[in-house]
Each structure stands twice: as C-alpha cells, then as structure tokens.
Amino acid sequence: MSEKIRVLLYYKYVSIENAEEYAAKHLEFCKSIGLKGRILIADEGINGTVSGDYETTQKYMDWVHSDERFADLWFKIDEENQQAFRKMFVRYKKEIVHLGLEDNNFDSDINPLETTGEYLNPKQFKEALLDEDTVVLDTRNDYEYDLGHFRGAIRPDIRNFRELPQWVRDNKDKFMEKRVVVYCTGGVRCEKFSGWMVREGFKDVGQLHGGIATYGKDPEVQGELWDGAMYVFDDRISVPINHVNPTVISKDYFDGTPCERYVNCANPFCNKQIFASEENEAKYVRGCSPECRAHERNRYVQENGLSRQEWAERLEAIGESLPQVANV
C-alpha cells in the first residue's frame, strides 16, 4: 500500500521585505526536499497549496514555522492517495489576492491586518446560514459555486472574483443595512474582500474563518448545509465537504445526470470548464460544441491518439461530421 500524500493549504497576511528575493529562496528550499505545489509570495504575505509525503510536508511546515514571520501560520491538512501537483511553482506577485479594484477606480489600498470582517468559526457560520436575516455571499468564481456551495448562499452574477466589487456596488442597496457574511475556499480572499466591504460602509460584515476547508473538517458541524463538492485549484479538482448528508448538485453538460467531474473543453481556444462523465467525455471527444468537437487541434483526439477515421466515427455516432480535407 502506497504512503498517503498530505496536501497543505495555507496563507498569511504579513509584511515581507524583499519579497521577490524571498520567493526565489522559498522555491529553492521546496525543490530541495521534493515538494510539489503552487505558492504566491508578495509584499503583503504568502498564499499556497503544496503536497508531498508525510516526511516532506513535515520538513516544509517546520521550515516555514522556523521563520518568526510565519511562526503561527495555520496549515490546513488533507490526506490523499496521490499527489495533487506535478511540479513546484513559487511566484512573486504584487498581491497574493487581486481584487481588481484599481481597474474600476476603487480604493485598492486594503490591508487585512488593519481592516477585515469579523471572524466566524464553523458553528457561528452555521448559525448564520440558518438566520433568515443574514445575507450569505459566495465570493468565489462562478464555476466554483456551480460545483458546490452553502445552502441559501447568494451566487453573484459574475464570472470571476475580480468582478465581485462592482457587483456588490451595483446591488448594495439590497443588503447594505443587513448582516453580511462571506466565504471562500480557505479564507484568503475573504480576508481582503470583507475588509473592502467594511470600507464601503457595510455595518456588519463577517467571514468564515479558515474557509470552506475548515468548515468541512470541524467535528461539530461536519460540513452540514454544504451542497455539492468544493472546487480546488490542483489535480484533485474537487473535495468532499458535507459528511452528514452529502449531495451532488452539478449536472453532466451532455445529458443532465448528476456529475461532479470537471473537464476543460478540448478545443484549446475555448477551454470552457464543463461537467462530464468519462463515458460522455469519450463520446463527445470532450468538445462543448460541434465546432469544438471537430476542431483541428482537439486535445482529446491528440491525447488519446485517435486516428482521423476513429474521430469521424465518434462524431458520426452523435450526428456530426468532420470537415472535408482538401485534396492536394
């Protein structure tokens, strides 16, 4: 039996001097111990998800905690049967969370160490979910919400997180005077976004401390009132949260049956994320439209080594065809 892999999810807002130089040092250490993952380092802090065996992840946590800036950094730990990443990336960025505020002439100077929403533990957050007078706002991207979300949470009409501030401004009259609680995967986005909401004048703003990941591991709430699965930005794609009465809410793009398996459209110029069973992925060569299924650079066809005849036969089976190849 192979050894379990641990996946570490973490962040910390803290001032990092010479952050670009520190990012290079961080990458060097990670590679030296064989860690895999993706880490962002900025002047405002660090945000990462990494994976490795027990010994490797323990070495990494000990090394991070040995730096007084990160002595109290909170690692959220999952155990998996296989690696969540294939390579190791550590990148320097201007911010570990980009709200896109400056793009909309918003005040972009948000420091979660100075201004942020009230922390709610899982029990308090569950109580907020059950409170009819509390507005629960999902701050993630649309495709994350579609895979899973808290029951009754608002799905903003946005495609990605950077569009959320404008959406809130456009709809603030609906809940400006109400209690608003926000949530995200691990908490890093909510730290900054809830601070922005406080700056915007919202009187009562809370956030799920530690994010959905912590809620799912809490021994008391056990992820209850979460519907579906949680989207994660690694090879796992999704992880279970509700251990009381789990449900599947997402539906297969092709036949509408319950499905939590996300794939990207095989047309590299489309890349749309869709839910699809392995059977339907093969049947529709992972294309979200007739054009994508017949695209000359269809990645499913390339990855699976389909001959042109085999490709044509699959399309013919669903009433479609490949374009004719001109004779030379």
From Swiss-Prot:
Reaction catalyzed: uridine(34) in tRNA + AH2 + O2 = 5-hydroxyuridine(34) in tRNA + A + H2O
CDD domains per record: RHOD_YceA (cd01518)
Keyword annotations from UniProtKB, A to Z: Oxidoreductase, tRNA processing
Coiled-coil intervals, chain numbering: none
GO MF terms held by the record: oxidoreductase activity, acting on paired donors, with incorporation or reduction of molecular oxygen
EC number(s) from the headed UniProt entry: 1.14.-.-
Residues annotated as domain Rhodanese: 130-224
Pfam families the UniProt entry points to: Rhodanese, Rhodanese_C, UPF0176_N
UniProt keyword annotation of Oxidoreductase present: yes
Biological process annotations from GO: tRNA modification
Active site: 184
Xref: InterPro entries: Rhodanese-like_dom, Rhodanese-like_dom_sf, Rhodanese_C, TrhO, TRHO_N
Superkingdom assignment: Bacteria
Database matches in PROSITE patterns: RHODANESE_3
Role summary: Catalyzes oxygen-dependent 5-hydroxyuridine (ho5U) modification at position 34 in tRNAs.
Family: Belongs to the TrhO family.
This protein's name: tRNA uridine(34) hydroxylase
Origin species: Streptococcus agalactiae serotype V (strain ATCC BAA-611 / 2603 V/R)
Gene: trhO
